[in-house]
């Protein structure tokens, strides 16, 4: 008798994507981050749902409702900190996942890669709007500064900003709509994840060598289900260590002060996972130029597949490209550090050098080095 998982219309889909899926036998731990992102999304949706049951999106009561969640709701503090630190884990996994894609040439799966970029933008938008909801000082001023960037768009900028605000400043209307968007976006993200997986399963997974090897595929279950389970365990362990021992480690103390439009904090900065982009934005003295650089710092990922000059897909056997890749990682860490520093000497110069280096590595150096490597290998 045929197994029900192979005949039932719904179970068949699960079977083809999680059980009998032919998977390369040599994929490393770097391939764990996809499933970890799925776990992060589930944690965020669940904790977010319970937070939304007690939160009020009104400027007068938003801050107190978050305080009430932490003090009066059963395990409210746990739900709140799981949600806040869960976002940090989400971005750690996201950046690792994208880094893996660049290192091993997974960007040659164009549809999967492009949906991934849309997902990255959607998650960033969701995180930004979520940061506004507690209505602390950094929430308010972060929302003011970032939405104000749109005023750099010629002709329609100012009108666009006021339209997003729902008034002439960040106020009740802004908070309410941000809450609405913050609630709906994760479900849109979940739908996009399905499309991301659909396109991935059209081609099958890439592997560290970058060489397609259909004769050496193994079933996803039990080999990779157990491997993913180990990843889940490690992620939950790290998240719990963060939540239970230092829940405010990655947050900003200013956000424990209720929003006050009359008092600007000395240093306005976003959460740590946006600091690299914020540093690139600040490194350009012109407002429109800065906004374009900010958008391009992420959108540049869409150009990467067209700059692939190497005859090999993966960087596994390309030592010069590997060095360049790790310089890029170090550069991004430098930008993250600079984004959290005040705008003064020497941080301004370091930020500008790091920003130029970031774009130079991706747009100029990586394609050139690939051509040199081809030459060395007499290809």
Curated annotation (Swiss-Prot):
Residues engaged in binding a ubiquinone: 201
Regions that span the bilayer: 33-53, 77-98, 113-133, 178-198, 226-246, 288-308, 320-340, 347-367
Pfam family for this entry, one: Cytochrom_B_C
Cofactor note: Binds 2 heme b groups non-covalently.
Cofactor list: heme b
GO cellular component: mitochondrial inner membrane; respiratory chain complex III
Gene3D superfamilies: Cytochrome Bc1 Complex, Chain C
UniProt-annotated binding residues for heme b b562: 83, 182
Keyword Transcription regulation attributed: no
UniProt entry keywords in alphabetical sequence: Electron transport, Heme, Iron, Membrane, Metal-binding, Mitochondrion, Mitochondrion inner membrane, Respiratory chain, Transmembrane, Transmembrane helix, Transport, Ubiquinone
Superkingdom as given in the UniProt entry: Eukaryota
Described function: Component of the ubiquinol-cytochrome c reductase complex (complex III or cytochrome b-c1 complex) that is part of the mitochondrial respiratory chain. The b-c1 complex mediates electron transfer from ubiquinol to cytochrome c. Contributes to the generation of a proton gradient across the mitochondrial membrane that is then used for ATP synthesis.
Family from the record: Belongs to the cytochrome b family.
Other remarks on this protein: Heme 1 (or BL or b562) is low-potential and absorbs at about 562 nm, and heme 2 (or BH or b566) is high-potential and absorbs at about 566 nm.
The name this protein goes by in its record: Cytochrome b
Gene name of the encoded protein: MT-CYB
């Amino acid at each position: 008798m045929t197994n029900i998982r192979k005949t039932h219309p719904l179970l068949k889909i699960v079977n083809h994507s999680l059980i009998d899926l032919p998977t390369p036998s040599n994929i490393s731990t770097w391939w764990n981050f996809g499933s970890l992102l799925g776990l992060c999304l589930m944690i965020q949706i669940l904790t977010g749902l319970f937070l939304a049951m007690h939160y009020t999106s009104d400027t007068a009561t938003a801050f107190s409702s978050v305080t009430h969640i932490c003090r009066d709701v059963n395990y409210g503090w746990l739900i709140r900190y799981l949600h806040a630190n869960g976002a940090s884990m989400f971005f750690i996994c996201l950046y690792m996942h994208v880094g893996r894609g660049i290192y091993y040439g997974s960007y040659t799966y164009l549809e999967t890669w492009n949906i991934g970029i849309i997902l990255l933008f959607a998650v960033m938008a969701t995180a930004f709007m979520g940061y506004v909801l507690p209505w602390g000082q950094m929430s308010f001023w972060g929302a003011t500064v970032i939405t104000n960037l749109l005023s750099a768009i010629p002709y329609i900028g100012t009108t666009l900003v006021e339209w997003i605000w729902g008034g002439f400043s960040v106020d009740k209307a802004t908070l309410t709509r941000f809450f609405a968007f913050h609630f709906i976006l994760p479900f849109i993200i979940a739908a996009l994840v399905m499309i991301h997986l659909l396109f991935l399963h059209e081609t099958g997974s890439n592997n560290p060598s970058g060489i397609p090897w259909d004769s050496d595929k193994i079933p996803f279950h039990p080999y990779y289900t157990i491997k993913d389970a180990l990843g889940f365990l490690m992620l939950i362990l790290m998240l719990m260590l963060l939540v239970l021992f230092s829940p405010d480690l990655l947050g900003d103390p200013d956000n424990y002060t209720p929003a006050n439009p009359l008092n600007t904090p000395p240093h306005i900065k976003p959460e740590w996972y946006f600091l690299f982009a914020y540093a690139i934005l600040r490194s350009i003295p012109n407002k429109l130029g800065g906004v374009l650089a900010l958008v391009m710092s992420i959108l540049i990922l869409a150009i990467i597949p067209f700059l692939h000059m190497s005859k090999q897909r993966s960087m596994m056997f390309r030592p010069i490209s590997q060095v360049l890749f790790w310089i890029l990682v170090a550069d991004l860490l430098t930008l993250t550090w600079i984004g959290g520093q005040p705008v003064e000497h020497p941080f301004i110069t370091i930020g500008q050098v790091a920003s130029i280096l970031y774009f130079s590595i991706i747009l100029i150096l990586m394609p050139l080095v690939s051509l040199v490597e081809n030459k060395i290998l007499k290809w």
